[in-house]
Swiss-Prot record:
Originating gene: yidC
Taxonomic lineage: Bacteria, Pseudomonadati, Pseudomonadota, Gammaproteobacteria, Alteromonadales
Record's protein name: Membrane protein insertase YidC
Gene3D superfamilies tied to this protein: 2.70.98.90
Matching HAMAP family: YidC_type1
Family membership: Belongs to the OXA1/ALB3/YidC family. Type 1 subfamily.
GO cellular component labels: plasma membrane
Superkingdom per UniProt: Bacteria
Organism of this sequence: Pseudoalteromonas translucida (strain TAC 125)
Amino acid sequence: MESQRTFLFIGLMLVSFLLFQEWNTDYNTPKADPSATTQTLNPTSSESEDYVPTSSDSALPASATLAKRSVIEITTDVFKVKIDTRGGDIVETYLLQYEETKGSETPYMLLGEFDGKQYFSQSGLIGLNGPDASAQGRPTYHVEQKSYTLTGDELRVPLQFTDSNGVNFTKTYVFKKGQYDVALEYTINNTTSTPLQVQLYTQVKRTVQDKGSMVDQNYLGAAYGTDDDPYEKYSFSDMADKNLNKITLGGYVAFIQHYFVSAWVPMQDQSNTLYSLITKSNAAIIGVKDEAVNIQAGSEQTLTATYYMGPKESDVLEAIHPDLDLTVDYGWLWFISQPLFVLLKWLHSILGNWGVAIIAITIIVKSLMYPLTKAQYTSMAKMRALQPKMAALKEKFGDDRQKFGQATMEMYKKEKVNPMGGCFPILLQMPIFLALFYVFLESTELRHAEFIFWLTDLSAKDPYYVLPILFGASMFITQKLQPMTVTDPMQQKMMTFMPVIFSVFFLWFPSGLVLYWLVSNLISIVQMLIIYRGMEKKGIKVRG
């Protein structure tokens, strides 16, 4: 019985430590050492602000220094976007339906320049005749107007460039109402008398980030998917160690952070090259090079790709690419987390409050696990009832551990008690707890979600630490109700401080997660009282 309590304590501590460690590992990535990365650059790559990948078929001259930006502004119902006419890159994106901070009127800035750091989405045409491979540097596009506003279901923003040979290039961004994915269309009109060869590249560039504080949920890093590996993280340190270079059918690349993702999805019916590097200016880049294409004289061809910049919503991401929803990282228990999130979302659609939905899903989960809970507490109570007999056996056999062990097992067999009966149900419940942890941590829907009174953001810690304190109190009550007696002084101290330790752990956890644990504990207390009352009616002594 003492071993069961010790096992429970160690198990909970281990799970909490692993969760806390995983949280910090995923959301706090150490800064890569620029000196360790500069040697991996291709010698033909640019040392200017722009990095243009080397074509599969030709070396690229260095591009010119980036000129002062001339931008156009695009406003939709979900975006405010700025596009640099030089290169046609997306250099700033505000998500209009998401606040920067709770209660502020400032929309969330996903892409842009902030705090001396950059986060851009870039694309262009390289190859033998690609304008981005020109010795004069990246092309400066002509635009018909400086601002565009979505008024219907679709908005097309064309950027046009004509090279010295008279070849017309039209780079068009297509925005749609209510959507965070943007279509990219490159139309090449070969007006010359000779064939052209071009190659589309798409990439995301972000300044390497410093490690945040232990409890700060910061930028994670890059990720990619191939036909063999649907989702693989590629952190700043991974980039510093080795440049990514994978050829795949289809695929995607992305930068992921807490709640949001930006990702390029190339054409899926062709072979693409995924690449990465960290530049001397400490910018991390991950991108895709499409296959080189030949455009015959007098003909026209359009190359396409899709760029997503927005919240990590599984169903939306899956519609763009079947594996892109994996950037909503539910950990190795994703197969449990995903249906739990679907259930949570359904409950919210009925109840209208995410806090109430968390309480409801807790009740459902605890009800489904009640048979395991009953088996756990029943086993503990039976072990408690055998304590006098255990003490008698210990006195009878003294230091003869072999005979004491044999006699103990015979007693268990006679009394039909499994000494591990209280531990096995705990092990079965742990995956549920872990899965729910990732649901509460990863779900964009919980960002800035209100519950009651002071709990105005279930994705953030409790500002007044009320929930962690109540959790500690509920854990203390649970200890007092459990029918176990610990005689070892060290174990007594461990049990005494366990509620305090867990309360401290939960001080910085998302309040939605702490709410789940608190409600779970309260339900466990009620279930425990019901189970023990039934056992006492049967004449089984539960508490001493």
